[in-house]
Amino acid sequence: MAADSREEKDGELNVLDDILTEVPEQDDELYNPESEQDKNEKKGSKRKSERMESTDTKRQKPSIHSRQLISKPLSSSVSNNKRIVSTKGKSVTEYKNEEYQRSERNKRLDADRKIRLSSSSSREPYKSQPEKTCLRKRDSERRAKSPTPDGSERIGLEVDRRASRSSQSSKEEVNSEDYGSDHETGSSGSSEQGNNTENEEEGGEEDVEEDEEVDEDAEDDEEVDEDAEEEEEEDEEEEEDEDEDEEEEEYEQDERDQKEEGNDYDTRSEASDSGSESVSFTDGSVRSGSGTDGSDEKKKERKRARGISPIVFDRSGSSASESYAGSEKKHEKLSSSVRAVRKDQTSKLKYVLQDARFFLIKSNNHENVSLAKAKGVWSTLPVNEKKLNLAFRSARSVILIFSVRESGKFQGFARLSSESHHGGSPIHWVLPAGMSAKMLGGVFKIDWICRRELPFTKSAHLTNPWNEHKPVKIGRDGQEIELECGTQLCLLFPPDESIDLYQLIHKMRHKRRMHSQPRSRGRPSRREPVRDVGRRRPEDYDIHNSRKKPRIDYPPEFHQRPGYVKDPRYQEVDSFTNLIPNRRFSGVRRDVFLNGSYNDYVREFHNMGPPPPWQGMPPYPGIEQPPHHPYYQHHAPPPQAHPPYSGHHPVPHEARYRDKRVHDYDMRVDDFLRRTQAVVSGRRSRPRERDRERERDRPRDNRRDRERDRGRDRERERERICDRDRDRGERGRYRR
């Protein structure tokens, strides 16, 4: 018996080898999804042909065993998805005839199946998942929606059978690795060989009965599968139409958003190319899995494919792809807010640049520009200093556009916030060789509008009409730029979010209010405009003029504050002081005070009349003041006791005479300085005056000497004539 069984096995192996050699060989490592799909179709057609052959045996011999008794062989046979054929007692020719007939039927059934699948697959060209794995999600939904329990049980059976079929592919790969072939015939042959050896050990009777039970189950499965496939095809067509409509709407919406935002992101074409998203629409990405793992991955991919945005960023890792939907919404919100902020910044910048004057500032190095950005100051040559000061007084805004020599870029632009001032803390500029800090002018305070750089290539289209229409990048330090050209150049700079333009606009308005403040026509306004430190006059910082400037003595300084209500007691004093331009030197003429000598000043001072009568603090209207003693007509009266409380606080004793004390002290100081200056100047001027007098007297002396000489000559001539006459008279006498 053992020898016979071995001979039969050898014969069967030879037949299987012949069948295997008829199939063309393929590379095991290559994976062809189309051949895999053809294999699955052939498997289904083989099951149908085998079912037709087994109908005769089922009618003759009914099933004896229940489904529970054959659960083990059923699982093995269904998992391999092969029809087990008992070859016991069959010759080789009969076996070949059966295989030939089976292959003919399979060809016809395959042709019908391909026609039916081509109609359904043409509607969805980009979906490449096989039919069995693609319908798992819909089975679970249909199970929940089934109205009757019979329908739910039927769908449950379908899901179980499909799960068993999905595990077939992994087992076929194992069998193909063992026997050296991945074709269907080879794997089926190897599985048939293993099953035949098991059936021979268990007995021929059990094999026939198990085959009949499997055939019955296969019939039920095929009927359920056909119904389910028809329903699923209809559902697929409906869902495909819905998915296509949704995708078209999403694509149109994304195109609109892209036009509005004007971004440079790559759109829909990257969705199928990016491997980092782990969303694959190829055939092999789903078929390579097995069982429930493949179904779970497929469900996640379906959800991700529906919710994915057509705008795809380059991301790596699955975590980025999972959190992409939330980040895309944040990006949309951020983009809208950024657009609003940038629009607001642009409008504010245009307001700042309106009616401004633009100057090109050339720096020798980057260090000075960095120092200017850090401290908000700038210094330039005296020639440019005068130009910028005049522009600051006349223009609404003065914009300085900075550029480092040979850098190929603009380093930003700023607005002048003050005129130049001298005498402040020194700024350690990095100066070129041969240049000292004394060669620079004053220090300007500037407010930076943009600290970011702009390459020259982006401003190549701008020319400066005020520099012979040369490119705006060309120019010397202090070159003025035309208004339109300067505005366009500043708008080309990238926006600097770190700058608050609102404060800059507030400073501009404050400066405009100060310059346009109305003044009274009669006399100059008593309220001095409040000058900040940067707007002080250059002479206030003069180092050489170390003497303190004479202070204008207003009665008290409270009225200089804004919102001050004038005290009625000062009306008379103010009217008196307005008549005298300078109270300290009211009796001395201005030309004598400025240009005269000390003697002239003393002479004028002594010729001055008596001081005006003392006028103390006049009381409030309606309050009488006791008359002064005649002795105190021209002098301050002694301090009096505080009057009783009369509705207001009395003026302190020191405040009454503070003005007088300051006035006397200033008088003494000025007199001393005038005397010393007069003495020094007198000493220097005396020899010069003597020389001048001598020079003046020299022509007079010459004239006098000449006249004297002439007079002497005339007298001598007269004497000679007289002497001659006398001599002649005497001679005539003697002759007589």
Curated annotation (Swiss-Prot):
Which spans does this entry mark as compositional bias, Acidic residues? Answer: 198-255
Q: Where is the composition biased (Polar residues)?
A: 63-90, 186-197, 281-290
Q: Name one GO molecular function term.
A: N6-methyladenosine-containing RNA reader activity
Q: List the InterPro entries hit by this protein, alphabetically.
A: YTH_domain, YTH_prot
Phosphoserine-modified residues are S35, S118, S120, S146, S309, S316, S318, S319, S321, S425, S436, S546
Per the record, the GO terms for biological process are: dosage compensation by inactivation of X chromosome; in utero embryonic development; mRNA alternative polyadenylation; mRNA export from nucleus; mRNA splice site recognition; post-transcriptional regulation of gene expression; primary follicle stage; regulation of alternative mRNA splicing, via spliceosome
Q: In what residue span(s) does the YTH domain sit?
A: 356-493
Question: Which keywords label this protein?
Answer: Isopeptide bond, mRNA processing, mRNA splicing, Nucleus, Phosphoprotein, RNA-binding, Ubl conjugation
The outcome of changing W429A is: Abolished binding to N6-methyladenosine (m6A)-containing RNAs
Q: Where is this cross-link: Glycyl lysine isopeptide (Lys-Gly) (interchain with G-Cter in SUMO2)?
A: K96
| Gene Ontology cellular component annotations, sorted alphabetically | nuclear speck; nucleus; plasma membrane
Question: What is the deletion mutant like?
Answer: Embryonic lethality. Conditional deletion in germ cells leads to infertility in both males and females: mice are viable and grossly normal but male mice lack any germ cells including mitotic spermatogonia, while female oocyte maturation is arrested at the primary follicle stage. Ythdc1-deficient oocytes contain large cytoplasmic RNA granules, show extensive alternative polyadenylation, thereby altering 3'-UTR length, and massive alternative splicing defects.
Please give the Pfam families that the UniProt record associates with this protein: YTH (PF04146)
Bias (Basic and acidic residues): 1-12, 50-59, 91-115, 124-144, 151-163, 170-185, 256-271, 525-564, 688-736
Q: Where in the cell is it found?
A: Nucleus; Nucleus speckle
Residue ranges for the region (Disordered) are 1-339, 510-564, 616-652, 678-736
Q: Which annotated residues bind RNA?
A: K362, S363, N364, W378, W429, D477
Modification after translation (UniProt): Tyrosine phosphorylated.
Record field: compositional bias (Basic residues): 510-524
Q: How does it assemble?
A: Interacts with SRSF1. Interacts with SRSF2. Interacts with SRSF3. Interacts with SRSF7. Interacts with SRSF10. Interacts with CPSF6. Interacts with KHDRBS1/SAM68.: Interacts with TRA2B. Interacts with KHDRBS3. Interacts with EMD. Interacts with RBMX. Interacts with ZCCHC8.
As for what it does, the entry says: Regulator of alternative splicing that specifically recognizes and binds N6-methyladenosine (m6A)-containing RNAs. M6A is a modification present at internal sites of mRNAs and some non-coding RNAs and plays a role in the efficiency of mRNA splicing, processing and stability. Acts as a key regulator of exon-inclusion or exon-skipping during alternative splicing via interaction with mRNA splicing factors SRSF3 and SRSF10.
Domain statement: The YTH domain mediates RNA-binding.
In Swiss-Prot or TrEMBL terms, this protein is called: YTH domain-containing protein 1
